[in-house]
């Protein structure tokens, strides 16, 4: 279990990164979930119509119980219900999620649809995924499997606040293989992961250069990693500068969360009272 000090610091860091990435609190309501007790109340109410079987079949739950057998708790099992409460408490129609969250969003639609059917109403909308590009994004990790994320460990992910030196060190340690032995050989997952990240942060010319080198069996993974690290550093530079600027302004950060919580409680309170 994380210690409270770490949780508070993580919350602050996420807020700073959101603001640094360009989210404008004048247009978007930012708040801490624990500042909105109505979420916990709606979570409890939705749990009354959530079934054990469907929760146990959730892919994320099955993955978690494989990796943390010593801490399989009810919160882990019912996490999709909490996520649903987070979404539908404000009657969201569209949700910006990555590809790995598609199942949770489908479960949110299930809970919303079930509530509407049981109580003979069209109260909750059935939210759909909102994507900023042509397809839902899933940035893979540097360890060769899974997605890039904080829960998978520090070495698996590049964080927005990481220094250029740290980014370079992480990318250069990324998992690969011995290299292709046949022309146009299919890439193993660990190598494809690096190409997927390259596609997200580099130019098309850069991607094509390394694709061609791989297909011709002339690729040097060291060169690929150096280029990838350089492009990640350039891609994240504006955000990294803003993080440094914003993180020291504690008064501003508290103001953003206080005003966000007030707006969220007004919206969430209305939903819970009507439910």
Where are these regions (language model features)?
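Active-site oxyanion-binding pockets that recognize sulfate/phosphate
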Residues: 1, 91, 98, 218, ...
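Short helix-capping/linker segments at secondary-structure and domain boundaries
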Residues: 50-56, 89-96, 202-210
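N-terminal Rossmann-like or analogous alpha/beta NTP/dinucleotide-binding catalytic cores
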Residues: 1-85, 240, 244
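A short secondary-structure junction signal
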Residues: 57-58, 92-93, 120, 153
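Non-membrane alpha-helical structural segments and their capping/turn regions in soluble enzymes
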Residues: 5-8, 12, 102-105, 254
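Internal, conserved structured core segments that host functional sites
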Residues: 66-115, 119, 140
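Conserved nucleotide- and phosphate/pyrophosphate-binding catalytic cores
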Residues: 103, 109-275
């Amino acid at each position: 279990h994380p210690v409270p000090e770490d949780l508070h610091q993580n919350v602050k860091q996420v807020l700073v990164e959101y603001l640094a990435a360009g989210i404008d609190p004048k247009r978007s309501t930012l708040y801490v979930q624990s500042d909105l007790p109505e979420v916990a109340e709606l979570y409890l109410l939705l749990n009354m119509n959530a079934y054990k079987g469907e929760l146990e079949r959730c892919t994320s739950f099955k993955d978690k119980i494989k990796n943390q057998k010593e801490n399989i708790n009810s919160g882990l099992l019912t996490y999709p219900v909490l996520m649903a409460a987070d979404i539908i408490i404000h009657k969201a129609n569209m949700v910006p999620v990555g590809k790995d969250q598609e199942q949770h969003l489908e479960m949110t639609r299930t809970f919303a649809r079930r509530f509407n059917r049981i109580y003979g109403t069209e109260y909750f909308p059935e939210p759909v995924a909102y994507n900023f590009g042509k397809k839902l994004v899933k940035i893979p990790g540097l360890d060769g499997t899974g997605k890039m994320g904080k829960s998978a460990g520090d070495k698996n992910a590049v964080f927005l606040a990481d220094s250029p030196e740290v980014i370079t060190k992480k990318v250069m340690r990324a998992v690969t293989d011995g290299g292709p032995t046949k022309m146009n050989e299919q890439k193993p997952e660990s190598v494809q992961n690096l190409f997927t990240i390259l596609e997200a942060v580099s130019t098309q010319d850069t991607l094509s250069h390394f694709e061609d080198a791989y297909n011709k069996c002339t690729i040097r993974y060291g060169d690929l990693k150096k280029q990838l690290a350089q492009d990640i550093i350039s891609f994240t530079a504006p955000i990294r500068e803003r993080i440094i600027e914003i993180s020291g302004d504690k008064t501003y950060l508290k103001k953003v969360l206080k005003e966000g919580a007030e707006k969220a409680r007004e919206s969430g309170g209305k939903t819970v009272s009507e439910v």
